[in-house]
Amino acid sequence: MTQKRLFGTDGIRGTANTAPMTAEIALRVGQAAGLLFTRGDHRHRVIIGKDTRLSGYMIEPALTAGFIGAGMDVTLVGPLPTPAIAMLTRSLRADLGVMISASHNPYEDNGIKLFGPDGEKLSDATEMEIERLLHADLSGQLAAPAALGRAARLEDAAGRYIESAKSTFPKSQRLDGLKIVLDCANGAAYRVAPTVLWELGATVIPLGVSPDGFNINSGCGSTAPDYLCAQVVKHGADLGIALDGDADRLLVSDERGHLVDGDQIIALIARSWSASGRLRGDGVVATVMSNLGLERFLKANGLILDRTRVGDRYVAEQMRATGRNIGGEQSGHVILSDYATTGDGLIAALQILSVLVEEGRPASETCRVFAPLPQKLKNVRYHRDNPLLHPRVKQAIADAESGLNGHGRLLIRRSGTEPLIRVMAEAEDETTVIRIVDELCDIIAVSAESETQVHLS
């Protein structure tokens, strides 16, 4: 196998009870990953967590059966943030960690994310090997009856993560006097995130903390930030924090109800850590989606912006390769490798709050670190073939790049997690940005529709 079929940029993802997100495939994933990670003579263990989707009740036991059949003991921790699973995998010296989540997607979708014993997302090569085993005949490799694994629940898993998150906040600081609106997206952090802020002294106004299996990311969380911004203004809060369904990313609202994206958060933390001597390396790592304003701000402060392809796993890989300890995405994935191996929305929020406490200024001043260039991102859904291969689309892209004449950026790519074409343009002139994105999206949409009609005819 020369390329991955099941694994995208963030694990395996799809519509629940439809391939590849079926109980049968989840069972095979458990068997394949279990066989790959049962090396050595010690008892082997996998940590399995999930978010609050209804389909988690289907995927969790299927994975559990697969791992047990491969001879691995399974530790079930229930609904917890993705970064908590990475942390527990390291802390409990497990061989593997698994998070059942489709992150910011609606409840109909689900996914499987895998972490190695170091708490890092698996490499492309390892994922390819799991896919190879998944399609192989494993009947002669599974555990003998006496070597089957066992399953048990870790009752204090939430408490362990709560204490781990709190330990990243300066012991000399408290959140007394701060009113914070916290939107947990009816997702994995609905219990732990409010507890952390409350125990540190904040007055917490919790939103999205009543999951029912269907309402994850539904009109709430980081995918619906307007709700957060409105609630911040309504309650006269000092700050608003919105997490996504698995709490590995965040967006923030200042006290005026203005949104603060991942680029501003990265700049804020980088400025603070650079001033205190905590910033490692000569800059930060972000993706090609990050605003040129962030790059200019860092350059003005003697730092560089090291760009990677889209996906927090690629940001993390580049951080490890370069020794940098801050990285992230405009979408709100913020990786602080001093504390976590993956994006952690709650830990990033605590760093923002630490700066607010230290500076004593309102969030509208503290969190507006640089002036972003006009930028527009728009998605076009497609159903079958890649519309970017259509000659008319290729010509339109070439014309748009020529029109920018080196005074802006154009980025067009397929999503690694959904059947979407993402179109982003950035330039000094907002009117130009809007026109280019809208025109390209119209052409891509027409091409995608024509391809569908060809296949249906």
UniProtKB/Swiss-Prot annotation:
PANTHER family per UniProt: PHOSPHOGLUCOMUTASE (ALPHA-D-GLUCOSE-1,6-BISPHOSPHATE-DEPENDENT), PHOSPHOHEXOSE MUTASE
Catalytic residues of the enzyme: 103 (phosphoserine intermediate)
Organism: Granulibacter bethesdensis (strain ATCC BAA-1260 / CGDNIH1)
Gene that this sequence comes from: glmM
Function: Catalyzes the conversion of glucosamine-6-phosphate to glucosamine-1-phosphate.
Known catalytic reactions: alpha-D-glucosamine 1-phosphate = D-glucosamine 6-phosphate
SUPFAM superfamilies from the UniProt entry: Phosphoglucomutase, C-terminal domain (SSF55957), Phosphoglucomutase, first 3 domains (SSF53738)
A Pfam family per the record: PGM_PMM_IV
Protein name per its UniProtKB record: Phosphoglucosamine mutase
Main enzyme class: isomerase
One cellular-component annotation, GO: cytosol
